[in-house]
Amino acid sequence: ALHFVGHHVDHELVENIEADCGDRLERMREGEPRRFLLTMGGAGAQRELFKAVVDHMVPMVRSGEATLFVNLGDHRENWEWLEAELGSIRSEVHLHTTWDETRELADELRTSSTSGIHVFVYDNTFHAVYATNYLMRVIDVMITKPSELAFYPVPKILNERVGGHEAWGAIRSAEVGDGTVETRTIPETLHAIDLLTREEDLLTMYADGIVKNKAIGIYDGAYKSVALATGTVW
């Protein structure tokens, strides 16, 4: 049998949707720097786009418009590449390399403001992957290609696909109202960053959409799969 169960999402993300989206809108109303999380896959694809996003956001970070979190996963070669590309900007970057440090920072950000550029790189695959999930709750917008992260309940800028099948991740996110359509060029991605930083309507729409999606079960896929596997009722 084939069952449509919804998006597969970690329990703590689904459970805290209302609180986390409320915090995003409160930070926006208070004029705090917009918090962006930029993710890079292990293959290190899209380096030109990645560097363009960082370069574009440096002045925004310096002016207090935005804070940038960059998760490079467990591939240190990606950090070595980015560090070389940063040049003089390197002195402005806060590097985080352990899970304990990441967790402490994220926990602080639930109740405090933040600034600057923060880069995360690990020597452990599990820490590398889960850092994105853990940081997701305390950021305002995630910038990612439309892979599996396109289905997560966080406002998203979906940049150009790498695999052809990823087009559907962006389509789905746009359908349910929790992220942009696929921004197929670097200028489109940078324009989306500007809009989500300097305007309030898109972030409000995505946050409200995520809360509504939870109410109708869109993010209940993992729960329903377990129920089907165990013969229980969800």
Kindly give the residue locations of the regions a language model identified.
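Short, aromatic/basic amphipathic alpha-helical patches
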Residues: 1, 80-91
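Residues that mark the start of a beta-strand
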Residues: 35-37, 67, 155
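Catalytic binding pocket for nucleotide-activated donors in carbohydrate/polymer assembly enzymes
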Residues: 142-200
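Donor nucleotide-activated moiety binding/catalytic core segment of transferases
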Residues: 92-150
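C-terminal amphipathic helix plus adjacent low-complexity
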Residues: 109, 195-234
